[in-house]
């Protein structure tokens, strides 16, 4: 096993879950990043996984990987930045485990996130909101429920998850406000 394999296994299987408390989904996404990175190193840099040592991973190769994601795989800047975040997390971890390569890790950590184009948020018009609120069938129980939920979302500006997390104890009709816990 290479030093890269050893540290990557520890990073994914122990460090992220036990020390950082990352979710299963985060570990899955970080694993996917490293699968792509290993694929890049093999296909483009011609370094087989069983010959991939930490000394082979340079800032230039990481930049090449990020360029490959955008140009060859047609990933968005946002996806590229997410992949970079996963790599940066690994190299932060390495700073405390493999100090001999500190200069290499810090060079990789100096890679900046790309700016993503600003996306203007679109909103429903007043007519659109009115049309949406007219959709539930108020003669049925589910229709009345849906109408109340949509009205609460609209009036409060709350996120769907915030509404889902509400319990009866949070609602104070006497005071005309909802208490969030």
State the predicted function of each range.
Residues 1-181:
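Conserved catalytic core of the tyrosine transesterase superfamily
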